[in-house]
């Protein structure tokens, strides 16, 4: 089956997943830099050269890469661009100040991100600001730090449960260390408050019932309203995090709910859009900022940049509010002055610390964003539509799969009545259970995890299959079940627009991924034994 790959400039000497010590000095320095300046999630195994997500810092061109909802390996084209860029930086640093070079270049990243999103302003205009971060989870921590004890009121953050967002989000959103090591390489006490006495708390809301079906918008809104009422009565401020989109491609809570709650509770309620999947158009992001919602983005999901890189966008109103806010001294272990906007008081707590790993990861992500935005929207819509229709039809007709319930991505409250079709209304993450073909029901969460892990193993005759890691979505009886996800990324869409057969090749490749997944599921269910740990009620 033909694979969609970028045949432009690429470094043939880079071995997929090879440990850095096997490569020549220049490449080794680049690969070490790409996985530096973050927490332990970036660490690569010395033997395999891969991190906990099964990805390394060098291109893996054979992979069937449909797992961008979790993580991606840098593309050959982005790697080539970053390699050239890094070589220039190293040459410049032979005679120049690395701190000054970093401050200039990370400032350019901020400028380029805002430019690509259509957020450039002239000097006399109020400006949108961007805080850069080493991951999306860090952004939740930064937002909690900025809002903690504003007007001397404790903060309560409200997020979706971690199965739809991220494993560390709830801890970060409560102002606590969410990993054991931070980007400065300092060890920290996971779960400990960044600033003692902030007393930030986090509440979570489920968007699915126990059987995996979706709760109604009304049910979710009533629960949220109750939580915010209790917070107000206790003298707390609230930050509501709206996820657009979640791990299983949900916009939740709904925008109608968010806007109604904002109208009801006013200034005591702030809203942040968790758009860390970055499956949004520039126009949608601008519309959110026009509502004075904060917007969290990352470069490592839809954009398929190397893990991890993040940004928190703040509208002019929010920027003015945050400009004078102090942050905990402990935040200096997470970021340096240059990652924060000039003129912000938060910079006073931070040091001049360069994070060239973050710089390179954002450079790769923006390379992919620029290529994606260069594709006419009608072509993007055509690719997304064809992919979604083909994959959905296969999942509905194949006895090996069960589609996970989802709902349309409704952003009509941003636009009003409009007949214009936007590319980000078409799902690029499609979630499904694996059925037990040797009995009844679906595979257990443990069996699904086994399928996922075995698919990712590269063999002599078979490329590794990269799909979105299992998401715990349901309990059938007392047995947990998880859904897998097949996803499009910006590089896949770009590649699908590059030739007469490219789109059909993309869909054929997706069908191969589903073939391989069904085969592995059948093997795992057979090995687990007939009737053992099966979910007969699914």
List each model region and its residues.
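Well-ordered, non-membrane alpha-helical segments in soluble/globular domains
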Residues: 78-89, 103-110, 217-227, 252-264, ...
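Disordered regulatory segments flanking catalytic cores
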Residues: 102-120, 463-474, 490-492, 498
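Conserved small-domain helix->loop->beta segment predominantly found in fold-type I
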Residues: 369-483
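Conserved N-terminal alpha-helix of the aminotransferase class I/II PLP-enzyme fold
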Residues: 7-52, 59, 69-138, 146-153, ...
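Active-site C-terminal subdomain of aminotransferase-like
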Residues: 300-423, 517
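Conserved PLP-enzyme active-site core in the AAT-like
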Residues: 131-136, 140-349, 355
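Extracellular distal adhesion/interaction modules in secreted or cell-surface proteins
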Residues: 33-81, 98, 217-227, 457-477, ...
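PLP-dependent enzyme catalytic core of the Aspartate aminotransferase-like
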Residues: 1, 473-538
